[in-house]
């Protein structure tokens, strides 16, 4: 123990632990280790209090922790196992496996705190990432190496959409993915793991797994939830920087990262800012988001679920996230109530790459025409509610009819929801999506019933469904 820097615990306040060091004080963000109930407990230094005491945040429960316990300074930040050995495994915030399948066997570890790539190392190419989901590919397309946000209140389908994207992109993409479960339901994390095993994305009996899972779920203390996104990102950065891969990085949910940060901030006694959030909200978010970027070696495309408290998009937590995103997919409760899934709002969702120079004129024009029709329908809804459809002009009636068909055609059965809905999932090629919407806008399918457009894949299925409906009616 002679060369180790050892301190003793002087105070335990929930997740906050004060430690006194007689020798040198550990640096801020250093990891401290101690034995607690037969397990390793990690504390991260957050503040220096006076000459000999540090205030730390615990990464696990502090129940049963007593004053006087010895703590060892590691002299470095929390270290995360990285490399191909992490694929197919579930790891917690401090890099320990939690899937009961033995040690990870990694050869390399990296600290979870790192600088963002230098300005000169970043890549600026723009290319569309096809998801196979009609509403996204047409109206708010994702960009390779970009940041994508899925925003919505509770229970509108963020996690289902993220799981469908993992299913569609991770399988078609062939590269590696990293999933960071930040403060979400343990049940969903468990479901995701077993679904990945069933679909072959994770292989239990040998190499070939394509995804690493890093979990810090709702039941974890705030310290773990505030750091698990960084732990997951460290695994993804290794694949980008060392192996030159194009990595997919999924975060569910980025709001919980902010929420945990606000809990930690309050425990540390900082004065809160707007709506009770931490004063360092923008700094914390920037430190995470700036590391998620594409370099000349490889790229990280990140898909982040963003919980919107009380469906208020102006809340500081989602509003701070938006500043960093290339595309936002907004999920709307009113659309979910109509039974249209994915409940993506076609007018609120935005994308930086919906630009004729990136997607081409045909795609751009079709998307804008679809939005124009939907916007006109939205502005006519008050008149329809008060006076009824009969008071509209013939031209407006036609717009409403097409808008309702477009609205239904934006729905789509998902592979991951097959077990609930019983209808097989559909993956639609982007050319088919553009062709279908272009034809609806042009009025080529004005004669088909609205119901034929609901929960189908491409436009050919609409025609089939309409024939079937006509045959049944006859």
UniProtKB/Swiss-Prot annotation:
Pfam families noted in UniProt: ATP-synt_ab, ATP-synt_ab_N, ATP-synt_VA_C
Gene Ontology cellular component list: plasma membrane; proton-transporting ATP synthase complex
Protein residues bound to ATP: 152-159
Enzyme type, top EC level: translocase
E.C. code: 7.1.2.2
Record-linked InterPro entries: AAA+_ATPase, ATP-synt_VA_C, ATP_synth_F1_bsu, ATPase_a/bsu_AS, ATPase_alpha/beta_chains, ATPase_F1/V1/A1_a/bsu_N, ATPase_F1/V1/A1_a/bsu_N_sf, ATPase_F1/V1/A1_a/bsu_nucl-bd
Spans through the membrane: none
Keyword presence, Cell inner membrane: yes
Membrane-topology descriptor: Peripheral membrane protein
Subunit structure and binding partners: F-type ATPases have 2 components, CF(1) - the catalytic core - and CF(0) - the membrane proton channel. CF(1) has five subunits: alpha(3), beta(3), gamma(1), delta(1), epsilon(1). CF(0) has three main subunits: a(1), b(2) and c(9-12). The alpha and beta chains form an alternating ring which encloses part of the gamma chain. CF(1) is attached to CF(0) by a central stalk formed by the gamma and epsilon chains, while a peripheral stalk is formed by the delta and b chains.
Family statement drawn from the similarity comment of this UniProt entry: Belongs to the ATPase alpha/beta chains family.
NCBIfam families: atpD (TIGR01039)
Name of this chain's protein: ATP synthase subunit beta
Species whose genome carries this gene: Paramagnetospirillum magneticum (strain ATCC 700264 / AMB-1) (Magnetospirillum magneticum)
Gene, per the UniProt record: atpD
